[in-house]
Amino acid sequence: GLSDFGLSERANIPRAEAQAFINTYFATYSGISYYMLAIKEQARTQGFVTTLLGRKRQIPELAARNPTLRAAGERMAINMPIQGTAADIVKIAMIRLDERLLAGGFRARPLLQVHDELLLEVPRDEVDRLVPILRETMESALPLDVPLTVDIKVGDDWDTMTPLTRADAIAA
């Protein structure tokens, strides 16, 4: 939903170049334009949108007379099913991970969830055993037609996190 102006400012390119990029993007991925039009129409008709799991969000802004407010409602209608489904998925993963931590006798514990990211405190001697469980739990939280992949990092603090590849996990 970024405008040519917004893209030109962020990428430090001329607006015409930004618009050409946007046009090429939507021509290449035409399903995105279809989705955006369809979800806005559905939201206008029903007054709400839903996540894949059926959680609803009412969008009264779509009926606003103010065009700026109405445009904000359209952005909500486009983004909520995607972002809301991601939130649903991470919450499912959190519940299942907690169950697996308890069942496995782990001392590890979840500390924080930010968007689609989980931060855990894990004793060093549990890292190798927990990584495959964490990966499988998060990647299988909701079966979809596209694979969910997880990036796992380890470290003593956020500043020193090191990515852990699948090969690292297999070798452990």
Predicted regions and their residues:
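Conserved catalytic core of nucleotide polymerization and phosphodiester-bond processing enzymes
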Residues: 1-172
